[in-house]
Structure formats: structure tokens, C-alpha cells
């Protein structure tokens, strides 16, 4: 029997969803501590209204997590669900971590030491209100702001992690009440995509080498309430929450062309689950997963030439549990583990990714997270 709770549409759109520490300058590579004894790290943010922190969990070779520290962002969160994906981002070298501060309307950057611990570089205005999602390609950073009329805004990042606004980069979304969830660069850094829950559309922007963007071109979503998404090469997989209707959510796949047009490959492949909101690809691109907030489950799809097919007829590839409300997903760089943040469970669950794409729950996740914890990265 499927476990689900029907989310009111307003709740889905909103949440399917301490004192500052002074900024510290980044360390040079020679000042970094020795390599970590762990396989890697997993990061999330508290989204705390009194002061936001990035939480570090060290990742062992068996996928298990142990607390590794907390790091003030210099900004504040909201203390509540944000209805977003990708509130944290790593640059391609893994040297810098960025996070949004939805309460103070800022972006923070950190230097990532070799052991995964963080040094705050600084925090800067996001170019709008209530930043929800951040993305980076090379030295170009973009954020989508969900407050007010909503907009995107771009920045260059220096070799020391300092952000500078790109003139003219603050561009509108498709409407003044679009309900953005995520922004992300295409793998080549020339296209930006924003999902808009309230307008059932995707806004697409073209990005010049200097970081300036043009757009949006508005593409109707195949299904209602497009939410999270992930790229693998030219293939884009987007979750569709369908307003939180029971067992009605889906995922669509698109091919992203160089001119920014999106061509549907598979339209609205059902999850048979409730409120599919977050998406992650396996490292090899053969599988895609959605976190189904209303069902407490994860749905897996095989991906062949961009076409989606359910791994399990009932749509249940992994089970987090009743009331767990899984939201963000992250895959370890070695492709061995999928991590899921549960907003209801206040925990991070760990699943082994098997060769056939199936998931096996493994012990050793993280527990006792604060309400409102948001975002997930694996390094």
C-alpha cells in the first residue's frame, strides 16, 4: 500500500517544499589541512531565521554519515520550507561552495578545505528578494529570487570567491507571480533553465561567454507544477508535482538544443506517487530519481537516449517512510550512494545505488536536523 498525504496546492507551492561570524579570507592551497580520511562529504543548510549555517557530514566508504561541523553563512534563512531545489552549489573544482540566505536576501561563498571544512569568504546581496536557488558554471554565478516579482541575477566570482554583480543581468521571470523553484546552468554553461510552479512553465535564458543573459523564452511544461530538475549532457529531466494531487505526479524529459529550445522526449511519465518535487541523475546518466514528498518514497526511471521508463511498476524504488517528506536528493561523486533529505523526518537517509538502478536502504544517515533544513550536496 502506498503511503501518502495529500498536500494542499498552496502548501506545495510554498514548501514541497545567531550572530554573524566575521567573514574570513580563503586559505591558499598550501594552508589547507591534509586530505580527509573520509570518502567525501555531504552538505545541507539549516535555513535558520536567527542565523543560517551550512552543516557538514563526513561520508564514509559505506555511505554512512557522521557530523563534521557547522559553519555560519553570515546571513539568515526563513526557518520554514522554501519550495526549491539547489539552494547550495559547488563549483566544478569543488574549491568553492555557495549557498542562498533566503531570509537576508544574500548569497554566501565558502572556500572548501581538503578535509571538507569550510571558510566563509563573504555574503552579498542576491539582486532581489528571497533567493531560492543558485547555480555556477566556470566563474559565472546565477541565482533565482522568488520574492516580489521574482527575477534572476548574475555575478562573476573571483579566484578568491568574491562575487561581483554582472551589469544588466537582473532579468524577469515569465510573470510577476511565477513561483520559481530552481535555476541551473546546462552542462556547457550556455543555457539557464528556471522551473516555475505557478505558471506551469520553464523559463530559458541564453548566456554569453561574459555571463550576460538574454530571455526568457517561456516553454510550457508537459505537466502541472514543474519543480526540480537535473541535467545529464543535453538531457533535462523535470519533476511535475501536479499540485500535490494523490498519486498524480510525473517526470518529463527534454533535449536541450544549443539555441535554447527544448524538445520533449518523454512527456509526463507517471511516478504513480504524490508530489514528485526533486530530481537527481545517477552519475552515469542511466537512471533518474524523484523524491516524492507526499508519499515518503523515491521513484526511479531508466534513461535511454533521454527516454524515461519506470524501474518499478508501482513507482516505488526507495522508501523513506510515512511522514518523512523527502525533499532534496544528492548522489555521491562515485555514483555509489543516493542521499535524501526528509523535511518531515528531519533526517538524511542513505540508499545504495545498485547496478540496475534499484536502491537499497543502508544505515548510517543523519538525524535530529532542525525544521526548515534545506538543500543537499554530496562531494
Residue ranges of each PLM-predicted region?
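Short loop/turn segments immediately following the C-termini of beta-strands
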Residues: 47-49, 59, 102, 112, ...
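Bacterial Sec-dependent N-terminal signal peptides
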Residues: 13-37
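Residue position within the beta-strands of beta-propeller blades
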Residues: 44, 99, 143, 194, ...
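Asp-box/WD-like beta-propeller blade repeats and closely related beta-sheet repeat scaffolds
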Residues: 118-182
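Short loop/turn segments immediately following beta-strands, especially the blade-tip
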Residues: 57-64, 110-117, 156-163, 205-212, ...
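Blade-level signature of beta-propeller repeat domains, shared across WD40, Kelch, NHL, RCC1
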Residues: 343-379
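A short beta-strand motif characteristic of beta-propeller blades
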Residues: 67-79, 119-125, 167-173, 214-220, ...
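Beta-rich, blade/repeat-based domains predominating
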Residues: 74-93, 126-140, 172-191, 221-242, ...
